[in-house]
Amino acid sequence: MVLVLVVGCQSGASPDRPDESGQSSPLNQAAGSIPNLPLKRLDGSAFASGSLNRDSATVLFLLSPECPLCLDYAYTFRTLAEEYQARGIRFVGLFPGTYFSELQIKKYCSRFRLEFPMVLDPDYALTRALGANTTPEALLLNEQGQLVYQGGIDNWAYEVGQKRLEPTEHYLRDALQAFENGQKPPLARTKPVGCLIE
């Protein structure tokens, strides 16, 4: 199963091209690299982040209920989840911080019919462990919690407030397809465009 984590956005922009900064994510590439943090799902049930180190591949979306691009990409989040969950990939939304209330997050999920699990990260502990800093941002983890892909969903938005009519590169979908075929993704990391997590 693949877990997609989306985090909310603030006011940052990233170029629409692979990350050439040379900086690596704090997430260790070794198996079992995600710390076991006691978090809570939006429905109130417990969520141990260490579960991401086993059982299934996961796509994590870092989300915010008022980030313009999280709103714009909501349909894409839903269609990807519907398609790939049926093939054994797990999807999870991650909401860092306490800026937005649980009611605001529930309204966002209900409005766009996002039915995969939503996890709250009030202290940014998992967000920092993942090296995520933008919403929306996507991470693809294999069954051992190893990072396969991190960055933007596609190249539809190439700057904050600037979008193409249609995306010409589909970073996350390409990574998912490569993963299913036992291959490395065409790009392992891209710079997400969106809002900085505060």
Give, region by region, the residue ranges found by the protein language model.
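C-terminal motif of bacterial Sec signal peptides marking the signal peptidase cleavage site
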Residues: 5-8
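Bacterial signal peptide processing site
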Residues: 10-12
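N-terminal "domain-start" segment that seeds a small globular fold
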Residues: 16-50
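Short active-site neighborhood of thiol/selenol oxidoreductases, capturing the structured segment around
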Residues: 50-71, 176
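Short, thiol/selenol-centered motifs that function as redox-active sites or metal-ligating centers
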Residues: 64-74, 98-99, 138, 195-198
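Structural microenvironment flanking redox-active thiols in thiol-disulfide oxidoreductases
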Residues: 71-112, 120-129
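Short, internal strand/loop/helix patches
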Residues: 108-150
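Thiol-/selenol-based redox modules, centered on thioredoxin-like
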Residues: 142-198
